[in-house]
Amino acid sequence: MSKRTYQPNNRRRARTHGFRLRMRTRAGRAIIAARRRKGRKALTVSH
């Protein structure tokens, strides 16, 4: 039996999908804008 692939880690989660990482690229900023337009309560996992 292989180990489970999801090993939760808050720091890794924020660094991979966090707000500052999203703002770094044009595509990431587009994601934030789309989520704002849609009215998402949480824009990113860290924000």
Curated annotation (Swiss-Prot):
Gene3D superfamilies: 1.10.287.3980. One of its GO terms (molecular function) is structural constituent of ribosome. Keywords: Ribonucleoprotein, Ribosomal protein. Pfam families: Ribosomal_L34. InterPro entries: Ribosomal_bL34 (IPR000271), Ribosomal_bL34_CS (IPR020939). It comes from the Bacteria. The keyword Ribonucleoprotein applies. The keyword Ribosomal protein applies. One of its GO terms (biological process) is translation. One of its GO terms (cellular component) is ribonucleoprotein complex. HAMAP family: Ribosomal_bL34 (MF_00391). Belongs to the bacterial ribosomal protein bL34 family. PANTHER family: LARGE RIBOSOMAL SUBUNIT PROTEIN BL34M, MITOCHONDRIAL RIBOSOMAL PROTEIN 34 FAMILY MEMBER. This is Large ribosomal subunit protein bL34. It comes from Thermobifida fusca (strain YX). The lineage of its organism: Bacteria, Bacillati, Actinomycetota, Actinomycetes, Streptosporangiales.
